[in-house]
Amino acid sequence: MVHSSMGAPEIRMSKPLEAEKQGLDSPSEHTDTERNGPDTNHQNPQNKTSPFSVSPTGPSTKIKAEDPSGDSAPAAPLPPQPAQPHLPQAQLMLTGSQLAGDIQQLLQLQQLVLVPGHHLQPPAQFLLPQAQQSQPGLLPTPNLFQLPQQTQGALLTSQPRAGLPTQAVTRPTLPDPHLSHPQPPKCLEPPSHPEEPSDLEELEQFARTFKQRRIKLGFTQGDVGLAMGKLYGNDFSQTTISRFEALNLSFKNMCKLKPLLEKWLNDAETMSVDSSLPSPNQLSSPSLGFDGLPGRRRKKRTSIETNVRFALEKSFLANQKPTSEEILLIAEQLHMEKEVIRVWFCNRRQKEKRINPCSAAPMLPSPGKPASYSPHMVTPQGGAGTLPLSQASSSLSTTVTTLSSAVGTLHPSRTAGGGGGGGGAAPPLNSIPSVTPPPPATTNSTNPSPQGSHSAIGLSGLNPSTGPGLWWNPAPYQP
C-alpha cells in the first residue's frame, strides 16, 4: 500500500516533467538552428527589427503581440525551417535592405532622442517586456541591437536600459537650457555680493574723507546740500548729507550720492587751491561765491584734547578772568592759539554762570560785613570768633594811631553829645583810647575787643557826630 501510494505521485510528477521537456525541446531545436548557420542569425534580426519597422514588417509585429503565450513561441520559428535551402541568396538581399532601413530608423530614433529627450522611453519600455514575454531566446538580441546604437550615439545606450532613471536624468537636463537664459542676471548677482563688502568699505572710507575735507574747507552740511542743488540740480537737505556721513542711508542711495559728492568735493578743492588763501574761512568765501550762495562763513571748529582741557580747568579754578598776558602764557604752554584760549575762558565763565547763578565771587566780602558791623553776630561766637576779631583790632589799631589827632578833637563833641543824651556815656568814651592802643593786652578778654573794634570802625567809617550815640546805647553788654 505504501509503494502504490508513493508510485502515484511519481507518475503525476513525471507528466509535467515530460511536458516541460517537450516545451524545452522546441526552443533547443530553435537555438540549434540559430547556431548552425549564419542564415538563421539573419532571421532573428528580422523578427527583432520588425517591431521597429513601420511598413512591411507590421504584420509580423502584430503576430508577436497577439501571441503572448508560451505556446506560440515554438510555432513562430517553424515556417522558416522548410525555407532553409533558399536562405543564402534571398535573405542576404533582405538583410542588406533591412540594414539600410535599420540605419535610417536609428537616425530617426537618434533625432527623437536628441530633440525631445524622452519620447523614446515609452516604446522602449513596451518593446522590452514584449520581447521577454514572447521568446526568451530574443533577450540577447536587444544587446546586439544596442551595439550600433553605442557606436552611433552614446545617448541611446543609457536611456533604453534604464527607463525610470532616465526620466530623472533627462528632467534635470531640461531645466538646464531654461537656467541658461536667466543665468545672466544670476551671474551678475553673485559677483555683486562679493563686490558689496568692497563697495561698503569704499563708501565708509569716502564718507570719512568727505567729512574731514568738508570741515577743512569750512562748509556745513547744509551748504553742501544747497550747493549741490544749485550746481547739479539735485537739492539735498542737511539731514541727507549727515546721514551719508554717518552711513545711515541705504546702499543704493549711498551709491547714488557718492559720485555727486565726489564731483562737488573736487570742484570745491580746485576752487580753494586756485584761490590760494591760507585760512579756511577765506577758502570758504570764494567757493561759496562759486556755488552761488550768500557770503555766509563759518569758522573752523577746534577740538580741544582732554589733557589740554584739564589744564585749562585748573587755570580757570585759579583765575577765572586772566589778563591777556596770562592768556598768552597759557597758550604758549599748551601750544594753542591765544584766541582759542580766550574764547574758551569766555565760554567757561558763561557756563559757570549757568551752573551757579549766585557765583562765589560776590559772596566773599559778605561774611566780613555782618561780623564787622553787627555786634550781635560777633559776641556769641566765643573762642572761635576771637581770632578774626584780634586780626581786625590789630589792623584797625594803626588807623587809630594815625587818627589820634582826630580822636582828640572828637572827645569834646562826644562829651557834649553824651551830656545831652545821658551822663553815663562819658566815662566809656574816656576809656576808649586806653583800650585800643594795646591790642595784645586786650585780646585775652572777649568784651573789650569788640568795643575797641567798634570804636575804630566808628572813627573810620561812620560820621563822628552820629556814630558814638548809636554804638554806645547798648550799655548792658558791659560787665
Swiss-Prot record:
Residues 389-410 are annotated as: Leucine-zipper. GO terms for molecular function: DNA-binding transcription factor activity; DNA-binding transcription factor activity, RNA polymerase II-specific; RNA polymerase II cis-regulatory region sequence-specific DNA binding; sequence-specific DNA binding; sequence-specific double-stranded DNA binding; transcription cis-regulatory region binding. Residues 1-86, 166-200, 275-298, 357-393, 409-479 are annotated as: Disordered. GO terms for biological process: cellular response to virus; humoral immune response; positive regulation of interleukin-6 production; positive regulation of transcription by RNA polymerase II; regulation of transcription by RNA polymerase II. The keyword Metal-binding does not apply. One of its GO terms (cellular component) is intracellular membrane-bounded organelle. Residues 12-37 have a biased composition (Basic and acidic residues). Keywords: Activator, Cytoplasm, DNA-binding, Homeobox, Nucleus, Transcription, Transcription regulation. Residues 38-60 have a biased composition (Polar residues). Belongs to the POU transcription factor family. Class-2 subfamily. This is POU domain, class 2, transcription factor 2. It comes from Homo sapiens (Human).
